[in-house]
Regions:
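Intrinsically disordered, low-complexity regulatory segments
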Residues: 1-166
């Protein structure tokens, strides 16, 4: 999407390596705090989360939606707070660790679970896409499309501005 091979992203910074007040020049690089405050070395990190509604044998399918409380593995309501009625997060939402961005429920992993306990076929488990550990940001873009097999495919792109630590 960004064509980094044609339009590279980055900054060219000229530095002078010399001793500073008698300290060894291999210890560190000293930056002016004002240059960091004005945007030097800032970057934007993008991550794309992809969820597909898969079809399984026996006519069972995944479903992109807000999971019900009866679903096995249901999280707390606050984890689903950014989802709209279609089970997908809205563009511009500020998300953090463990927030659900694409709600999804799946049939039981093994058909033996249904037969063994004589449970109805509507028993489902939670398999939503959540923000990974150590990440946060804003929802930049949402794409709804179909996979090559004709399954519904949802992609959510997050954007995080990263500032160097001083």
């Amino acid at each position: 999407i960004a064509d980094y091979d044609k339009h590279p992203a980055g900054q060219n910074v000229t530095i002078a390596v010399m001793s500073y007040e008698g300290y060894n020049m291999q210890d560190s690089i000293i930056f002016n705090k004002g240059s960091i405050d004005r945007g030097l070395a800032r970057s934007t990190y993008f991550r794309t989360y992809t969820v597909e509604e898969l079809r399984y044998s026996g006519g069972l399918v995944d479903e992109i939606c807000i999971p019900d409380k009866e679903v096995k593995g249901y999280r707390s309501e606050k984890d689903y707070k950014y989802l709209e009625d279609d089970g997908i997060v809205y563009t511009g939402a500020t998300v953090k660790i463990d927030d659900v961005i694409i709600g999804k429920t799946s049939p039981p992993r093994f058909l033996g679970e249904l037969e063994e306990f004589s449970i109805a076929a509507d028993m489902r488990r939670e398999s939503s896409a959540v923000i990974k550990q150590g990440e946060e940001g804003k929802i930049d873009m949402t794409i709804l499309t179909e996979s090559e097999e004709g399954n519904k495919l949802v992609q959510v792109k997050t954007r995080d501005h990263r500032i160097p630590e001083i």
